[in-house]
């Protein structure tokens, strides 16, 4: 099982990724984790990436694809792997294709923007303990106060409505086109094309998991 998981921020990809990993016994490939590991280990690509990062630049797709290819050679990838958060752009998808990285499925978790904004902008946190609440789905006993300490809850900057709206804008302009990219490739009938599946990310967590497993058959 070799798959790419797509969906907007706040769609519940992380939760579903954990269930998929467990069911199929495959690792989740995170480019951020790979970069940090390569830099720490001082690999040739890690050294190259560190130079770029230290200068405040963005690590090139070539370096990222190199890291991906190295990562996929490791033993835990023998029965498959799952990409979450990569590729993010068409050039990255092209680079993966040219590098011959095999993909069986592209699974999109679809959630309307209005729902994403409600989910994310409703989050509240008690910073000292890490406890989290939601004004609608998991409210504190007293509005705006932590249940245990009575201290104020805060809305993280990342969860502010305008920040969420900006992240969604980036997703729709850069990452959402990947769905069409992979759909066109699948329709071409070329050998090695992935199957593209779309499921709703609305409803209870176990319902969404059932949809995901059914889509990956």
From Swiss-Prot:
Coiled coil feature spans: none
Region ranges (LID): 122-159
Major localisation: cytoplasm
Localisation: Cytoplasm
Residues noted as binding ATP in the record, renumbered to the chain: 10-15, 123, 132-133, 203
Catalytically driven reaction(s): AMP + ATP = 2 ADP
GO CC list: cytoplasm
Keyword entries, A-Z: ATP-binding, Cytoplasm, Kinase, Nucleotide biosynthesis, Nucleotide-binding, Transferase
Family: Belongs to the adenylate kinase family.
Protein name as it appears in the record: Adenylate kinase
Organism for this UniProt entry: Aromatoleum aromaticum (strain DSM 19018 / LMG 30748 / EbN1) (Azoarcus sp. (strain EbN1))
Gene that this sequence comes from: adk
């Amino acid at each position: 099982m070799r798959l790419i998981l797509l969906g907007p921020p706040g769609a519940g990809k992380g939760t579903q990724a954990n269930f998929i990993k467990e069911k199929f016994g495959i690792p989740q490939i995170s480019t951020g984790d790979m970069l940090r590991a390569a830099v720490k280990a001082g690999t040739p690509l890690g050294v190259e990436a560190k130079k770029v990062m230290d200068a405040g630049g963005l690590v090139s797709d070539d370096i990222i694809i190199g890291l991906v290819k190295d990562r996929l050679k490791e033993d835990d990838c023998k029965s498959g792997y799952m990409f979450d958060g990569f590729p993010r752009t068409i050039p990255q998808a092209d680079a993966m294709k040219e590098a011959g990285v095999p993909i069986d499925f592209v699974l999109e978790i679809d959630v309307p923007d209005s729902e994403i904004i409600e989910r994310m902008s409703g989050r509240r946190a008690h910073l000292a303990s890490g406890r989290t609440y939601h004004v609608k789905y998991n409210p504190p006993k007293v509005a705006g106060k932590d249940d245990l300490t009575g201290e104020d809850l805060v809305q993280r900057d990342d969860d502010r409505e305008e920040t969420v709206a900006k992240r969604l804008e980036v997703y729709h302009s850069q990452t959402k086109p990947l769905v069409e990219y992979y759909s066109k490739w699948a329709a071409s009938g070329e050998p090695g094309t992935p199957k593209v599946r779309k499921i709703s990310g609305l409803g209870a967590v176990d319902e969404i998991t059932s949809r995901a497993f059914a889509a990956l058959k």
